[in-house]
Structures are given as C-alpha cells and as structure tokens.
Amino acid sequence: MIADSSVLKKHTAIKRSTRIISLTLVLLGVFSFLLLTWNDSLEFYNSADPSENKKNSEEESEKKFVYKLPNLLKTADSFLSNENELNFQKVKEEISNIQSEVEVDIPEPSSKATSKFSSRSFQTDNVVTATTTTTLNPRSSSLALQKNCDHKKFDPRTDFLDIIRTSPAVLFIKSSQADSIFLKNLLQREFEISPELATVDLEKHSHGYELEKYIKQNKLNIDTSAALESIQSPYLFLNGISVINRGMVRDIIEPHSKGLLLPLLKSEARGNLLVEKKDIPSNS
C-alpha cells in the first residue's frame, strides 16, 4: 500500500512538469506570433502613406542643399573673381600695346592719353571695357601735316627726268601762246620723227609753273645774266639737250626759212632719233 502511494506521487509530479513546459511553449508561440504581426502592420502603414515619406525626403534634401549651398557660392565667387583678374590683365596688356604704338608715331610731349575703365558685375559675364582717348595739340597736328606735305612735295627735277624718259624727242608748250602752236604744227606737218614726239602742255600740267621755272634755270644753254622773264616757251629737247636756247626766231624760224632746220635736228638726233622731211604736195 505504501509502495503504491509513492508511485502515485511520482507520476503526479511528472504530469505537473509536463503541463508547465507545455504552457510555457504555448505562451512563447503566442508572443512570437504577436511580434511578427506587429512588424507586418508597421511596414504596411509606411507603404500606405507615400506623401509623408516624400515630404520627409524633401526636407532632408533641403537640409543637405542648405548645408552645401554656401560652399557652392563661395566656389563660384572665387572662380568669377579669378576670371575678372584675367580679363583685366588682358585689357591692360592691350592698352599698353596701344600706348607703345602711339608713343612711336607721335612725340610724347605733344600728346596726352587718358584711359577709362568700366566693369560690370559677374552677373553680366564679367564684361570689362576700356576706352582710350588720345588728344593732340595744334602744334603736333601742324607738324604732322607739314611732314606729309613735305613727303608729297613736287620735285621738278624728278618730274622732268620722268618726262624725258618717255621719248628722245620732247616738246614743252603753252597752248595759249602762238610760238608754241606754230612749232608744234611745224614739226607734226613737215617732219617725220621716230620715236614719236612727246608733247607736254605746261598750262595743263598740275605743276607747270614750277616745271617751267626749273627748265629755264637748269636746262637751257643761255647766258646766266639773261632775265628769266624774257625766255618764253616752247622748249624742244632731243636726247635731253635743249634745241631752242636763243629764242624761236634765231633757233627755229631763220634756219627753217634757209632750209637748215632738218640738218640741225639730225645733228641733235645722234642716231637715237629718225628725223626726215615729209613730202608735202605742192599747190600747183
């Protein structure tokens, strides 16, 4: 009887332990189920409200942008400042080149150069402009004008030589004077001259007065004591030598009336000119 009682107590203790373990496992399972269910509900709630998530993302982006914006502005300001310095340096070099050229062409004491600079802000692409003004005094201008006039001043000697080179036979006339017209017609009507006679009208020449004065003073075989006013055109040159030195009557008209003008012209031709008498038909 006593043995049966001890066995019964032992069996009852085992059942109690089994129940406790089973209950513990059940509670643990329920707790795990509730935990998994809560996580799924939280993820569904977050996915069901995208506007709020988007708003939060935008706020975070704005915070990051505000944080980085000062650094970007500082970098842009530094870049534009460097570009301003480069532009200003280029303009300064160009102005130096212009001033050096002005100093070469114009005497320094007679010129004044002022430079004005105006710059725009970096918002308008950092445009830097330069204005250079050069002022010349009247004395400098007159000297420059006189220099140009002297450079283009008429040289009668050079002009005379250029005309003589056009032909071995050259006749200088004045179309308003009878002696000039008479000699021109005489040579063209009665004489064959080759190369062709070159005729220069001093009244139509742009510097006829200076050219005639040079001929009278330097190219005629006359007495140096003779007055230049008494010498009149025409002036005939064969091979650069003057034929008329004592006047039209003594050097042209008298020899022509005696039949001596052709030999006179041939003697001055010296083989460089062909001078022949033309066959003039008689009136009979």
From Swiss-Prot:
Protein's recorded name: Pheromone-regulated membrane protein 4
GO CC, any one term: membrane
Keywords assigned: Membrane, Transmembrane, Transmembrane helix
Domain Glutaredoxin: residue ranges: 157-272
Gene3D superfamilies: Glutaredoxin
Parts of the chain that traverse the membrane: 20-38
Topology class, membrane: Single-pass membrane protein
Compartments where found: Membrane
